[in-house]
Amino acid sequence: MSRKSERLVNLTIALLATRRYLTKSEIFRSIEGYEGNDESKERMFERDKDDLRSLGIEIEVGGFDPIFNDEAGYRIKPE
């Protein structure tokens, strides 16, 4: 399995397994393959989200507190 495929599988599992939204920093810390500086991690994550969406996987984006404009979080709602 390629590194990218492994990272996409691990990202999918992490986003499915959580009940709350995961921040990018949590994702970058917990999923192997997000390496380099912050900008390269961001670009990689955006490509990964696009790849998952092109496969029909719906990624929810939400915040932790609707009153405050907190950092966005991500999850996949189980069907």
For each feature predicted by the language model, list its residue ranges.
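Short, basic/aromatic recognition patches that contact phosphate-bearing ligands
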Residues: 1-79
